[in-house]
Amino acid sequence: MEVLKKGTTEALLIYMRDRLGNLTDLNTVTGNTFEVRKKIDNSLIQPATAWTVDPDWPMTAICVIDTNISGYVAGDEYKLYIRYTAGSESPLRGPIEFRVEDD
């Protein structure tokens, strides 16, 4: 599980794989957003935030997490969900779990 320091803005790199092989480059998708929810009660912490594609790894999403947002509490765990549209498909990927700590 990734650990982020409270009071920072950091990128989480999320590698995605299409088991059918239809998608080989995330630069071709639209509607690139992610959201973060608190693991314990599923409350929304960081709503519909845009993610970008890693220029060196076209199947890796860069999700920037801002732990300065008031909902992030040191010691708590969070779930990240990624959304996008590729052709007629609109998957929801996740949860990808991470924790926020003071140090």
Can you say where each PLM-predicted feature lies in the sequence?
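Contiguous segments within soluble domain cores/interaction surfaces
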Residues: 1-103
